[in-house]
């Protein structure tokens, strides 16, 4: 649901503070706000986050609402991240040229692929913005994103889910101490397990879990 009351805001700040207290100052903490704040509430929230020094605050308000995003970026010391819903370098151009954020998050599935992500990263580099590829679709997106990340100087961090190819790749990606070993074999460096993929065709996924609802069950997705 949307965060639209001080009570909700205080509860979320407390959660971030609890995470910071648990992991200490040597672990980076990024906060994904998932467009759930109005510009006014987002301004209050990121100000409350400043003492906790998050790596970035992702999509505090709607990513297509450019003017409030720009105003927010200019009034806080918390780096603002956005871009997972933007398409091609032309879609990222206003974000970069007007410096609406500190971190760009192109998704390789729909930003235009490997070369387009590199172009977006180059645009960002000129404005001293970081690249943090978004990925919420599976290990193949991670494999493609880390190849781009390894070739750009302004790479910050790469998003990935719990699966790094287990049960889908013959040799899953390897994560150790927060780093993924870059595959060295041709292409994306992963070999799909066709039999495992065929066996997974009948798997189900609860799309309802991706939407927000108010306490009374009414639809609340933005």
Where are these regions (language model features)?
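Shared catalytic-loop signature of beta/alpha-barrel
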Residues: 47, 53, 64-187, 191
């Amino acid at each position: 649901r949307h965060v639209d009351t001080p009570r909700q805001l205080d509860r979320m700040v407390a959660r971030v503070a609890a995470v910071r207290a648990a992991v200490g100052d040597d672990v980076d903490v990024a906060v994904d706000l998932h467009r759930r704040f109005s510009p006014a509430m987002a301004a209050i929230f990121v100000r409350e986050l400043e003492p906790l020094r998050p790596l970035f605050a992702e999509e505090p308000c709607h990513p297509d609402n450019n003017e409030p995003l720009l105003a927010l970026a200019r009034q806080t010391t918390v780096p603002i991240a956005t871009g997972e819903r933007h398409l091609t370098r032309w879609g990222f151009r206003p974000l970069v040229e007007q410096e609406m954020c500190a971190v760009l998050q192109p998704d390789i599935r729909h930003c235009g692929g490997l070369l387009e992500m590199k172009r977006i990263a180059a645009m960002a580099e000129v404005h001293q913005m970081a690249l943090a590829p978004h990925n919420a679709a599976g290990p193949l997106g991670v494999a493609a994103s880390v190849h781009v990340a390894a070739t750009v100087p302004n790479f910050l961090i790469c998003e990935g889910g719990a699966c790094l190819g287990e049960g889908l790749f013959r040799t899953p990606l390897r994560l150790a101490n927060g780093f993924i070993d870059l595959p060295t074999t041709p292409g994306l460096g992963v070999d799909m397990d066709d039999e495992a993929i065929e066996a997974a065709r009948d798997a189900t996924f609860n799309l309802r879990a991706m939407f927000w609802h108010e306490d009374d069950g009414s639809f609340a997705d933005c």
